[in-house]
């Protein structure tokens, strides 16, 4: 192999290392696990179990607090697995905290996110409100279909109980819920940092401690982009975004980790040394033994074992998984209108499954299948799998209702 080919391979590895860190710390931890937690807490504190919005959102909070608590013990804590296996090391949570300062809840709605990232443009004639600039973009194509199904379901459901904006504005529980989700009633939040000599973190909404009950997203509560929660449209978009984050977004960033990154040379998470310069022994090694140079540069054996073991667990579906379009409580409501709306949602998701399967058979859509012959199924809802048995373990498909792993 020519040395320039080795340099190019190393360059791609450095990019992948940084992308791996962004994926784990931002796309996964921050943008799903961390930001959803204040909504979980506010829902349980401010909305009675008979409140229609509590019934709407409850399935999408299943086991989230439990898995987040475990994450703080072994993943995001000082000297935890994140610090051990991703390139920022001890700065991992600092990076998440810094990025959180510019986080925008409304931009996590998929159509808005795609436009912000330059992957779509506003298009009033499209049923999704946007048109894709890259048509063969499986995450966006499948995601917009799922997003639309979620938003249609939420809209129909909410309008059963809120026939006008005045009714919504007069709902004391709902307004208290939204206020708690945003406002810091007691404390100003301190951004994540180590306490001198302790190795422990003090942090914002990413590491909720004793003040969690009164915090929510308090440190960014004054941002002008927050919905005011005065219209049905705002409620529908807010609940749709919460459900999207908890279900489809988390499925897309989590359950493909082992299938796509289980072979560490293909997806290194740490770089052990900088790009070799001409005249150095590292450059000579790149010339004479490129494979050895590559292995010496990327994630170590111990870090690889820990990292692969971790994503193997994270990428696995449990046998009791409850997928989008399913309810684990058959008698979740006695309202026939709500039941009919949910059944329409379920059938819509099953239709999306068929569309995804057909697209994955289309040879012209190369990004869906690729040279590796690995079809994109991360946003395949798996609604039709009534007992979840066919999707147990590492399947790289299925959208669970909630962030439970």
Per-region residue spans from a language model:
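Long, compositionally biased charged/polar stretches
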Residues: 1-405
């Amino acid at each position: 192999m020519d040395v320039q080919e080795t340099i190019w391979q190393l360059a791609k590895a450095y990019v992948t290392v940084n992308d791996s860190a962004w994926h784990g710390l931002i796309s996964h931890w921050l943008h799903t696990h961390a930001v959803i937690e204040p909504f979980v807490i506010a829902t349980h504190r401010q909305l009675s179990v008979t409140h229609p919005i509590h019934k709407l959102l409850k399935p999408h909070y299943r086991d989230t607090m439990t898995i987040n608590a475990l994450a703080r013990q072994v993943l995001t804590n000082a000297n935890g697995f994140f610090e051990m296996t991703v390139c920022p090391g001890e700065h991992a949570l600092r990076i998440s905290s810094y990025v959180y300062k510019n986080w925008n809840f409304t931009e996590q709605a998929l159509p808005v996110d795609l436009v912000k990232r330059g992957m779509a443009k506003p298009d009033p004639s499209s049923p999704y409100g946007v048109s894709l600039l890259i048509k063969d973009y499986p995450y966006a194509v499948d995601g917009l279909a799922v997003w639309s199904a979620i938003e249609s379901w939420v809209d129909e459901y909410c309008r059963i109980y809120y026939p006008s904006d005045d009714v919504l504005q007069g709902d004391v529980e709902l307004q208290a819920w939204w206020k708690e989700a945003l406002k810091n009633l007691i404390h100003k939040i301190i951004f994540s940092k180590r306490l001198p000599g302790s190795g422990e973190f003090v942090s914002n909404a990413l590491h909720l401690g004793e003040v969690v009950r009164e915090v929510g997203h308090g440190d960014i509560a004054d941002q002008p982009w927050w919905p005011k929660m005065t219209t049905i449209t705002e409620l529908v978009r807010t609940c749709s975004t919460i459900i999207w984050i908890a279900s489809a977004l988390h499925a897309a960033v989590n359950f493909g980790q082992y299938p796509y990154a289980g072979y560490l040379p293909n997806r290194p998470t740490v770089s052990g040394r900088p790009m070799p310069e001409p005249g150095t022994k590292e450059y000579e090694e790149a010339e004479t033994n490129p494979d050895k140079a590559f292995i010496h540069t990327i994630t170590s054996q111990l870090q690889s074992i820990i990292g692969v073991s971790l994503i193997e667990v994270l990428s696995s579906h449990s046998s009791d998984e409850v997928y989008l379009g399913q309810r684990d409580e058959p008698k979740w409501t006695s309202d026939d209108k709500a039941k009919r709306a949910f059944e329409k949602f379920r059938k819509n998701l099953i239709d999306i499954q068929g569309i995804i399967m057909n697209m994955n058979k289309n040879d012209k859509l190369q990004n869906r299948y690729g040279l590796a012959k690995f079809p994109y199924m991360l946003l395949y809802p798996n609604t039709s799998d009534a007992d979840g048995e066919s999707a147990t373990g590492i399947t790289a498909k299925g959208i669970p209702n909630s962030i439970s792993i």
